[in-house]
């Protein structure tokens, strides 16, 4: 409550009297409604899938690794991605960005026995997305899409988030989603340390951040270096 020790003279007598606090300060506070804390937190009972982002250079075995997933199906934007896989591997080759979203929605809505969905590669899928937005807005540059001022980049992020949301819903049904990407070297400027280079997904920084933040697991493929002679002899 505000202090009541301040005084002021009354108009009639000039005698100092305490200032009364406004009624709003003396009104009783409304009681806080009671609720059960345990109803806010629930344990997961249904089996859930994982969203995995796997990055690496071409021909390093990303697609081969995904063949070990349970009952996988491919959304194949990279047409050469399954060359080393059996012809019986189920796949669909999207022609447009919308085909990718429709395929994920169908996998979400329709009955099937697939337990993993592989997007191979998101690097090519993002190129499809930009082409789709340019055609939709009848522009020749992403900078001009939506009237410019960064709107095109915002539309890209919105569409990526739409696909991520579909994948997360598939995860809730116990279906794994695996996203493959090419990689590139990226220079990181640090305010404290010297600048350094790191391996990054070959896409725009903002969309790469969306994928990395949404993923349960982020993995990068590294070459396996075998040096049996040096290990056995101790010689360089």
Task: Name each model-derived stretch.
Residues 34-131:
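Conserved P-loop
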Residues 129-156:
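A solvent-exposed, charged loop/short amphipathic helix patch at secondary-structure junctions
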Residues 159-173:
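Catalytic-core regions built around general acid/base machinery
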Residues 177-236:
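Phosphate-binding/switch region of NTP-binding enzymes
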Residues 7, 15, 39, 45, ...:
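Short beta-rich binding modules
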Residues 113-116, 173-179:
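Loop/turn-to-beta-strand initiation segments
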Residues 1-8:
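Interdomain "pre-motor" coupling segment immediately N-terminal to P-loop NTPase/helicase cores
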